[in-house]
């Protein structure tokens, strides 16, 4: 998916983990995934922004995933993954403007909004596409989740 900027399945996979497992498991997997990709692709000051944004969005996704109407509706979960993608971009922008001392948050944020939209749209599509695969790979967690409903 290199030809479409900011569209990767990692966020959607992490949201699936956040929905299906404990919050601590999801955060640990997110931390290791983020550090692994940053070691491979390049680490810099943006790593801290990514870590903060990913942590906040995973916590929100995990908490909202407990709401009964969201818990039972994949489309709503995917839509919330879309919103978390937009929130991720907002948090990154806020931290980057502060870190690099850019004069205008609004100008910086608006410049990256299209990329945030691509990321959010990728979350939506990948969440819906990966759900059945994720369910087959981790059937035990779904059986436990259905028992606890």
Predicted regions and their residues:
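Interfacial aromatic-anchored transmembrane helix boundaries in multi-pass membrane proteins
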Residues: 1-9, 31-65
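Membrane-embedded alpha-helical hairpins and interfacial helices in multi-pass inner-membrane proteins
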Residues: 47-48, 70-149
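Central hydrophobic cores of alpha-helical transmembrane segments
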Residues: 26-38, 76-85
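Generic transmembrane alpha-helix motif of multi-pass integral membrane proteins
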Residues: 9-26, 60-64
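Membrane-interface helix caps of multi-pass small-molecule transporters
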Residues: 3, 16, 59, 63, ...
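A generic alpha-helix surface/boundary motif
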Residues: 10-12, 30, 89-90
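Transmembrane helix irregularities
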Residues: 20-21, 39, 121
């Amino acid at each position: 998916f290199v030809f479409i900027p900011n569209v990767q399945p990692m966020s959607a996979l992490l949201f699936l983990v956040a929905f299906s497992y404990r919050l601590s498991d999801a955060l640990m997997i997110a931390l290791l995934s983020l550090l692994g990709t940053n070691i491979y692709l390049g680490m810099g000051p943006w790593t801290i922004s990514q870590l903060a944004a990913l942590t906040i969005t995973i916590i929100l996704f995990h908490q909202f995933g407990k709401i009964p109407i969201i818990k039972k509706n994949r489309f709503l979960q995917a839509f919330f993954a879309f919103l978390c993608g937009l929130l991720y971009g907002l948090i990154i922008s806020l931290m980057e403007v502060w870190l690099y001392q850019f004069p205008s948050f609004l100008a910086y944020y608006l410049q990256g909004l299209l990329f945030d939209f691509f990321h959010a749209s990728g979350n939506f599509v990948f969440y819906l596409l990966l759900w059945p695969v994720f369910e087959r790979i981790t059937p035990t967690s779904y059986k436990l989740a259905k028992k606890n409903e």
